[in-house]
């Protein structure tokens, strides 16, 4: 089933339907728009007919100056069997040749009062968001001090319990158990909860709780950008864990590498506090303050001074 249809765009931006109503369920498969300027001049060799076509003042003014015999042919060539829609900006008058061609080929003709540039920007942003690559990950997403922390790990390791403690400490839950992720651009991952389990948290022995009902609207978020992954795993005796914080591990989600920390779990460790500190430390690193690097530089200076004294 297509993610976006012409009707979705029409409803989202309250566009006026002029003609071609039978095609309002046509699928839109790409976020790129087309301004068919060259096509108005008769050059259709590389016409991107699978895109939404946007006609502004420039295109319509040029079209009106064409000879009558060419107008109908231009519009028939513009309205193909796979063109999702033709949108006119600025409430421009609709050429009768366009109405006739759209009815003949079932291409919706829509109109907006917005300026062409603004309409282009809004349409592109909406389509990129809706058509972005998506995936789903088993885990918990929490907003901790403004950092989107994705908590992952095997079932039963304590992800939901940790999220509950974080919510009690004033942070905000985004999703539990299943996190739906979409890649809005090259380095931006947005996580959200499936509608069925939004604001819900499952705690073993307690059952399902509604976080918004228990803790208020300030304890939840609808979506959050994922900037840090925390992997919880049971403590393995003999396994070496990072103790300085110099090793930078990443996790690939869709096409984006996200910084990842592995936290060993065992009785007595307060995971909520560790995640809070990890989020604050992550923000400090992005500001250029790295405690681990400062320590190694100081250690190197001490060693160097000791060697000089000898």
Curated annotation (Swiss-Prot):
Cofactor(s) of this protein: Mg(2+)
EC class of the enzyme, as a word: transferase
Residues that coordinate or bind ATP: 153-160
EC number, UniProt record: 2.7.11.-, 2.7.4.-
GO molecular function annotations of the record: ATP binding; magnesium ion binding; phosphorelay sensor kinase activity; protein serine/threonine kinase activity; protein serine/threonine/tyrosine kinase activity
Residues the entry annotates as binding Mg(2+): 160, 202
Record GO biological process: regulation of carbohydrate metabolic process
CDD domains reported for this sequence: HprK_C
Swiss-Prot/TrEMBL keywords: ATP-binding, Carbohydrate metabolism, Kinase, Magnesium, Metal-binding, Multifunctional enzyme, Nucleotide-binding, Serine/threonine-protein kinase, Transferase
Pfam families linked to this entry: Hpr_kinase_C (PF07475), Hpr_kinase_N (PF02603)
Catalytic activity from the UniProt record: [HPr protein]-L-serine + ATP = [HPr protein]-O-phospho-L-serine + ADP + H(+); [HPr protein]-O-phospho-L-serine + phosphate + H(+) = [HPr protein]-L-serine + diphosphate
Catalytic machinery residues: 138, 159, 177 (proton acceptor), 243
Region (Important for the catalytic mechanism of dephosphorylation), start-end ranges: 264-269
Protein's UniProt keywords contain Metal-binding: yes
Spans annotated as Important for the catalytic mechanism of both phosphorylation and dephosphorylation: 201-210
HAMAP family: HPr_kinase
Function: Catalyzes the ATP- as well as the pyrophosphate-dependent phosphorylation of a specific serine residue in HPr, a phosphocarrier protein of the phosphoenolpyruvate-dependent sugar phosphotransferase system (PTS). HprK/P also catalyzes the pyrophosphate-producing, inorganic phosphate-dependent dephosphorylation (phosphorolysis) of seryl-phosphorylated HPr (P-Ser-HPr).
Recorded family membership: Belongs to the HPrK/P family.
Domain notes: The Walker A ATP-binding motif also binds Pi and PPi.
Additional free-text comment from the UniProt record: Both phosphorylation and phosphorolysis are carried out by the same active site and suggest a common mechanism for both reactions.
Subunit structure: Homohexamer.
Protein's name according to its UniProt entry: HPr kinase/phosphorylase
């Amino acid at each position: 089933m297509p993610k976006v249809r012409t009707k979705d765009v029409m409803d989202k931006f309250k566009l006026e339907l002029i003609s071609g109503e039978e095609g309002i369920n046509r699928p839109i498969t790409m976020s790129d728009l087309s301004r068919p300027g060259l096509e108005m001049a008769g050059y259709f060799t590389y016409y991107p007919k699978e895109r939404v076509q946007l006609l502004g003042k420039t295109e319509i003014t040029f079209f009106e100056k064409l000879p009558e015999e060419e107008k109908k042919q231009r519009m028939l060539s513009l309205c193909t069997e796979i063109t999702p829609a033709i949108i006119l900006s600025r409430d421009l008058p609709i050429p009768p040749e366009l109405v006739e061609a759209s009815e003949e080929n079932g291409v919706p003709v829509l109109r907006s009062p917005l300026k062409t540039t603004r309409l282009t920007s809004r349409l592109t942003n909406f389509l990129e968001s809706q058509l972005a690559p998506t995936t789903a990950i088993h885990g918990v997403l929490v907003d901790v001090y403004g950092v989107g922390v994705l908590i992952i790990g095997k079932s039963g390791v304590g992800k939901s319990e940790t999220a509950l403690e974080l919510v009690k400490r004033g942070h905000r839950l985004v999703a539990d158990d299943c996190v739906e992720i979409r890649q809005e651009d090259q380095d931006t991952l947005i996580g959200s909860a499936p509608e069925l389990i939004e604001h819900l948290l499952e705690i073993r022995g307690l059952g399902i709780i509604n976080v918004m009902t228990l803790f208020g609207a300030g304890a939840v978020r609808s979506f959050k950008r994922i900037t840090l992954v925390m992997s919880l795993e049971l403590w393995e005796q003999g396994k070496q864990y990072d103790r300085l914080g110099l090793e930078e591990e990443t996790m690939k989600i869709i096409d984006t590498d996200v910084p990842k920390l592995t936290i060993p779990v065992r009785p007595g460790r307060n995971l909520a506090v560790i995640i809070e500190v990890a989020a604050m430390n992550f923000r400090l690193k992005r500001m250029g303050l790295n405690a681990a690097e400062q320590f190694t530089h100081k250690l190197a200076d001490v060693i160097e001074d000791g060697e000089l004294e000898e």
